[in-house]
Amino acid sequence: MSDYKIWVDADACPNPIKEILFRAAERKALPLVLVANQMIRVPPSPYINQIRVGAGFDVADQYIVDHVEPTHLVITADIPLAALIIEKGALALNPRGELYTVDNIKQKLTMRDFMEDLRGSGVHTGGPDSFSQADKQAFANSLDKWLVRV
């Protein structure tokens, strides 16, 4: 089981998702590493660690990319980070329960870039819906599917 690990792009990860991950790490005796450029409160546990990286653009992302392995799962809403994780053969799951895959990541990147271009030209595109109980449940279900394989 020591080959498996969960990484969290923790700066923007919703607290309810962190709580689910804390419980899963304890239940499965599975290493969980939260990477952020600020201190993140984590419960005392031999399985849960927090890595604080320096401030700067994508510093936490790069730390995760540098350390992830194919048997690992990365929790992130950052689509470019998810693409890098997939290139390294690992899995990426967003906090709303959607698994990023080789089959869908190019489309996700294209849509992200398109929306960014629209915003850059002054078009108001809105943001994602508020994080909901349904999102939390979808994440828990997706995580459980991965944990069954561990």
From Swiss-Prot:
* Entries under Pfam families matching the protein: DUF188
Q: Which domain of life is it from?
A: Bacteria
Task: List residues traversing the bilayer.
Answer: none
Write out the similarity annotation: Belongs to the UPF0178 family.
* PANTHER family in alphabetical order: UPF0178 PROTEIN YAII
Report the protein name in the record: UPF0178 protein Sbal_1771
Species lineage: Bacteria, Pseudomonadati, Pseudomonadota, Gammaproteobacteria, Alteromonadales
